[in-house]
Amino acid sequence: MLMKQVSAFLLVGIGGFLGSAARYGASLLLSPVAGGLPLATFSVNIIGCFFIGFISELALSTTLVSPESRLFLVTGFCGGFTTFSSYIFENASLLKDGQMLYTSAYLAGSVIGGFVALYSGTFFAKIWT
């Protein structure tokens, strides 16, 4: 059992490393052409959403994606590449389950909470320095 958990952590970690490296590569590639627009972030978020949807559907409806491959690709790679794709997938899952109130709260709470947390962090960093 312990070896299976260690293997899962390694799959997620290696996938996360590769996803993070791919995100960094996208920022190097797209930043010079964006002219101030956060094109790299926008692009990886949209690509990540497509990829997590594609892989998750294959994992659910076929035998093409093993549970280990799903851990590596979805949790690891997509997690390192973009957390936005996980956020959208979780909201879609809530919607699919008919949880409109939870979906609305999660969407609004994440966006509003994210802005509040960002500005709070900025505020406290300015006080601290």
Swiss-Prot record:
Domain of life: Bacteria
Pfam families given in the database record: CRCB
Membrane topology qualifier: Multi-pass membrane protein
Predominant location: membrane
Keyword Transmembrane in annotation: yes
Catalyzed reactions per annotation: fluoride(in) = fluoride(out)
Positions bound to Na(+): 79, 82
One cellular component (GO) term of this entry: plasma membrane
Activity modulation notes: Na(+) is not transported, but it plays an essential structural role and its presence is essential for fluoride channel function.
GO-annotated biological processes: cellular detoxification of fluoride
Alphabetical UniProt keywords: Cell inner membrane, Cell membrane, Ion channel, Ion transport, Membrane, Metal-binding, Sodium, Transmembrane, Transmembrane helix, Transport
GO terms assigned for molecular function: fluoride channel activity; metal ion binding
Subcellular compartments: Cell inner membrane
Residue ranges crossing the lipid bilayer per the database entry: 1-21, 35-55, 71-91, 105-125
Family classification: Belongs to the fluoride channel Fluc/FEX (TC 1.A.43) family.
Function text: Fluoride-specific ion channel. Important for reducing fluoride concentration in the cell, thus reducing its toxicity.
Protein name per its UniProtKB record: Fluoride-specific ion channel FluC
Organism: Chlorobium phaeobacteroides (strain DSM 266 / SMG 266 / 2430)
Gene from which this protein is expressed: fluC
